[in-house]
Amino acid sequence: MAGLVYPQYPVFPGYRQPYRQLPPFYKPKQPYWKPPYKGVPGPMKPTNPLDCLDGYKWAQLKALLSQLGPEFGLGRRFTKEVGVQVNPRVDACIQCSLGPRTLKNCKGGPFLFHAVPGQHAGLGIIAPVRFPRTTAVYSRLSDRRLFTLPTPTYGGKKEGGTQMDPVEEDLLLKRPTFQFLEQKYGFFQCKDCQIRWESAYVWCVSGTNKVYFKQFCHKCQKGHNPYYVESIECKRCKKAWCSCPERRHIDLKRPHCQDLCGRCKGQRLSCDKTFSFKYII
């Protein structure tokens, strides 16, 4: 309209342009999530409102929705979510956002997981989570009975005298036999090279002095079994967990073997930090 009412060229040549009314100034309303102009930050609105939640609340929300049903999930359909366990000290619901399926339950294992009422009550999350670790066979924390498997009866009958199912009999026959090894201290001698050495990495069958692995001479590279094997234990109290009143006792003839005990008071190694356990299938 301003172009139609007022001419675009001046009326008198050589004279300045006539006064021209500006078009009406409309000040558009800025959305509240955008800054009014550059240089001054305004309140921003996140693209996804659920991004405001922290990791813990986000995992709790997803776990709660997963309990209601699969149609209440927050992710896309036909997609899979994978939870990666990084650190055992991290909370279970932060490690994996799959609700109660945080860790798989191994049937028959010594570490069974049960839902414990606590801070995750109502969500069905397993807490606390126990992570099995390897324990030394000669440690006080271990139990020899846990390392023995029941011997299968190949006669085809159970203890009660009833006939066994052929499927169960096949499973017993296919079950692997474990041989648990125990670390001991051994003394070696090579007669060809006239060399003697000691080693604390002698793996014997648990409860016996039967050596499972041979050690090679560093000169002739021949495998040898130790001529003498002894347990890594205190030389005074004869226990893997030292109970002597003295803080330290050293055998001057073999100080290295004494230091490898690791359970005497004041020693360099401690029982909780020593892991020496192997098994062979």
UniProtKB/Swiss-Prot annotation:
Taxonomically, the superkingdom here is Eukaryota
Q: What is the effect of changing residue 217 to A?
A: Abolished binding to the 3'-UTR of mRNAs
What biological process terms from GO does the record include?
negative regulation of translation; oocyte maturation; translation
Give the UniProt keywords, A-Z.
Answer: Cytoplasm, Developmental protein, Differentiation, Metal-binding, Oogenesis, RNA-binding, Zinc, Zinc-finger
Tell me where in or outside the cell this protein is found. Cytoplasm, Cytoplasmic ribonucleoprotein granule
Picking any one GO molecular function of the record gives:
zinc ion binding
User: Hey, what tissues is this thing expressed in?
Assistant: Expressed in oocytes.
Tell me which residue ranges form 3CxxC-type zinc fingers: 183-267
Signal peptide (residue range): none
Give any Gene Ontology cellular component. Answer: cytoplasmic ribonucleoprotein granule
What does the entry's free-text domain comment contain?
Answer: Disordered regions undergo liquid-liquid phase separation (LLPS) for the formation of membraneless compartments that store maternal mRNAs in oocytes.
Q: How does it assemble?
A: Component of a cytoplasmic ribonucleoprotein complex together with eif4enif1/4E-T and cpeb1.
Give the protein's function.
Answer: mRNA-binding protein required for maternal mRNA storage, translation and degradation during oocyte maturation. Controls timing of meiosis during oogenesis. Probably promotes formation of some phase-separated membraneless compartment that stores maternal mRNAs in oocytes: acts by undergoing liquid-liquid phase separation upon binding to maternal mRNAs. Binds to the 3'-UTR of maternal mRNAs, inhibiting their translation.
**Family indicated by similarity:** Belongs to the ZAR1 family.
* Name by which UniProt lists this protein: Protein ZAR1-like 1.S
Annotated source species: Xenopus laevis (African clawed frog)
